[in-house]
Amino acid sequence: MDYAKYIDHTLLKPDATLDQIDKLIDEAKEYHFKSVCINPTYVKHAAEALKDSDVLVCTVIGFPLGANTSATKAFEVEDAVKNGADELDMIINIGALKDGRYDEVRKDIEAVVKASGDHTVKVIIETVLLTDEEKRKASEISKEAGADFVKTSTGFAGGGATVEDVKLMKEVVGDDLEVKASGGVRNLEDFKAMIDAGATRVGASAGVQIIQGLESDSDY
């Protein structure tokens, strides 16, 4: 198994500097990670730096709360794609989901999918804030709305991916969607557990440590 191709090498901290982004990019090129996952302000820079590589540019939409309007999320997508983003990790409207306003949740995802064109859309459902039934419903709605992935977490809500959540999400979406595990994957053992549970992508700032079999103290 080529572990690197499962990893979105991630730096989403609000205080991330250009030097840190460049380090992330260099590591991604060296280890041939699937993508770098970065905030939208760095997409254009990353796309230019990675244009002759096999590393994709992934960015986040409505991050980290998911509480933007659908129109705002759609504009973020259009801007990110224009700047060179290949993949888009959006956050659902979590409050709407918990209220049972499922049409609103679905239309929010659909707005992002439509704006993305043929680009990959991953839907972050923020599992740490949901009951198991809400996780199932969010995964079902993501499938109905035409997303490509369901994703566990932002890493900013006090919890990350668990094996149990990945299994639950995969059970719901089956082969129709892929599952991305993110948040708290700090070493090769964690990584393998997520893959065994059904994830086909792992978001982690510890990509290098995972590949090297080391341990990271990062929360994402």
From Swiss-Prot:
Catalytic activity of the protein: 2-deoxy-D-ribose 5-phosphate = D-glyceraldehyde 3-phosphate + acetaldehyde
UniProt keyword Cytoplasm present: yes
GO CC, alphabetical: cytoplasm
Domain of life the protein comes from: Bacteria
EC category name: lyase
CDD domains recorded: DeoC
Pathways involved: Carbohydrate degradation; 2-deoxy-D-ribose 1-phosphate degradation; D-glyceraldehyde 3-phosphate and acetaldehyde from 2-deoxy-alpha-D-ribose 1-phosphate: step 2/2
Active site: 89, 151, 180
Keyword Lyase included in the entry's annotation: yes
Enzyme Commission code(s) on record: 4.1.2.4
Pfam family, one: DeoC
Molecular function, one GO term: deoxyribose-phosphate aldolase activity
Compartments (UniProt record): Cytoplasm
Keywords, comma-separated and alphabetical: Cytoplasm, Lyase, Schiff base
Protein's GO biological process: 2-deoxyribose 1-phosphate catabolic process; carbohydrate catabolic process; deoxyribonucleotide catabolic process
Function in brief: Catalyzes a reversible aldol reaction between acetaldehyde and D-glyceraldehyde 3-phosphate to generate 2-deoxy-D-ribose 5-phosphate.
Family the UniProt entry places it in: Belongs to the DeoC/FbaB aldolase family. DeoC type 1 subfamily.
Protein name (database record): Deoxyribose-phosphate aldolase
